[in-house]
């Protein structure tokens, strides 16, 4: 058949590129793992992983670094998806941080994120002896991610040096590393937030319902709407929890993640909203505003 008779949408091309990258990782690395944070990008990655190796089960496990402060609904969704898909899931909690009672309320966003997420991830990768960790970061999210390679090399201490990365020519990736080094791989690098939602709509991928607008109890704090997800969130003097129509564009630890006021309760509504919004999804991440806690500095220390 004449190749000119084929028509590929931009989503088809993005899907093909991501599946190629996933297969390349499995072929080139000794012990890869997929970082599953339970968000929309992770949900797309899991769907692509299942597609890439169907009808066989995925040949690599999923890894979730649990800070113990994720939204309750995220954990319930994670467990349901693992049961539905049959994938192997590893859950890691930084027990040293637990022993120190590290939390975002008492210790703040920067300390909590560093100990429970960054150090927790480094522990999990070392314990599992993983040489490649697949993540869902995209270049449109934030300026430091915009300059990161698809194959992002980390030294033996998991540190990222943005000035010491390898060139990537077309779809040719260099997977050679020295003992102790590792690579973070980002198959969704060339996707946008809108692409992710269009693909979720086309493929009917399940996502956490927190992405859809609904009346939820929130307090306004530091210019953000914080969901009162459980009794661990203390109200400040004068604060009152109110039901407001909100949804989340990004998900993380609930005291550090701001909701946005919205009536987008369906995938079609979310896509329509994405077409007109002028703001980045990371406007709702409190950690990005912490002094000395820029995304680049966190990534240099080993962050996702």
UniProtKB/Swiss-Prot annotation:
For this protein, the Enzyme Commission number is 2.7.7.4
Q: Which Gene3D superfamilies does the annotation name?
A: HUPs
Q: In which pathway does it act?
A: Sulfur metabolism; hydrogen sulfide biosynthesis; sulfite from sulfate: step 1/3
Q: Which Pfam families match?
A: PAPS_reduct (PF01507)
Nucleotidyltransferase among the record's keywords?
yes
Q: Which reaction does it catalyse?
A: sulfate + ATP + H(+) = adenosine 5'-phosphosulfate + diphosphate
Entry-linked InterPro entries: PAPS_reduct_dom (IPR002500), Rossmann-like_a/b/a_fold (IPR014729), SO4_adenylTrfase_ssu (IPR011784), Sulfate_adenylyltrnsfr_sub2 (IPR050128)
GO terms, biological process: hydrogen sulfide biosynthetic process; sulfate assimilation
Q: Supply the alphabetized keyword list.
A: ATP-binding, Nucleotide-binding, Nucleotidyltransferase, Transferase
**What is this enzyme's class at the first EC digit?**
transferase
Keyword Transmembrane among UniProt keywords: no
Provide the GO MF annotations for this entry: ATP binding; sulfate adenylyltransferase (ATP) activity
Top-rank lineage group of the source organism? Bacteria
The protein's job, in short, is: With CysN forms the ATP sulfurylase (ATPS) that catalyzes the adenylation of sulfate producing adenosine 5'-phosphosulfate (APS) and diphosphate, the first enzymatic step in sulfur assimilation pathway. APS synthesis involves the formation of a high-energy phosphoric-sulfuric acid anhydride bond driven by GTP hydrolysis by CysN coupled to ATP hydrolysis by CysD.
As for family, the record states: Belongs to the PAPS reductase family. CysD subfamily.
* Entries under PANTHER family matching the protein: SULFATE ADENYLYLTRANSFERASE SUBUNIT 2
Q: How does it assemble?
A: Heterodimer composed of CysD, the smaller subunit, and CysNC.
Q: What is this protein called?
A: Sulfate adenylyltransferase subunit 2
Q: What is the lineage of its organism?
A: Bacteria, Pseudomonadati, Pseudomonadota, Gammaproteobacteria, Lysobacterales
Q: Gene that codes for this?
A: cysD
């Amino acid at each position: 058949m004449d190749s000119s008779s084929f028509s590929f949408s931009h989503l088809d091309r993005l899907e093909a590129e991501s599946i190629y990258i996933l297969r390349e990782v499995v072929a080139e690395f000794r012990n890869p793992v997929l970082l599953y944070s339970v968000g929309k990008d992770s949900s797309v990655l899991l769907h692509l992983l299942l597609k890439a190796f169907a009808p066989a089960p995925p040949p690599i496990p999923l890894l979730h670094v649990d800070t113990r402060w994720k939204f309750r609904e995220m954990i319930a969704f994670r467990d349901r998806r693992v049961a539905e898909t049959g994938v192997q899931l590893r859950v890691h909690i930084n027990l040293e941080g637990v022993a120190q009672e590290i939390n975002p309320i008492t210790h703040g966003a920067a300390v909590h994120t560093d100990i429970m997420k960054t150090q927790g991830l480094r522990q999990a990768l070392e314990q599992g002896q993983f040489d490649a960790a697949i993540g869902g970061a995209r270049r449109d999210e934030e300026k430091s991610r915009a300059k990161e390679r698809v194959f992002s090399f980390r030294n033996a201490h998991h540190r990222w040096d943005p000035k010491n990365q390898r060139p990537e020519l077309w779809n040719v990736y260099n997977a050679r590393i020295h003992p102790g080094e590792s690579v973070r791989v980002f198959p969704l690098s060339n996707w946008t937030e809108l692409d992710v939602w269009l693909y979720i709509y086309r493929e009917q991928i399940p996502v956490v319902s927190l992405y859809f607008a609904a009346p939820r109890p929130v307090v306004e704090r530091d210019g953000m709407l914080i969901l009162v997800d459980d009794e661990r969130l203390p109200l400040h003097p004068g604060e009152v929890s109110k039901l407001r129509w909100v949804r989340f564009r990004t998900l993380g630890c609930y005291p550090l993640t701001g909701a946005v006021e919205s009536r987008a309760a369906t995938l079609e509504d979310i896509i329509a909203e994405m077409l007109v919004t002028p703001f980045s999804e990371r406007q709702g991440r409190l950690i990005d505003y912490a002094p000395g806690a820029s995304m680049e500095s966190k990534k240099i220390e080993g962050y996702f």
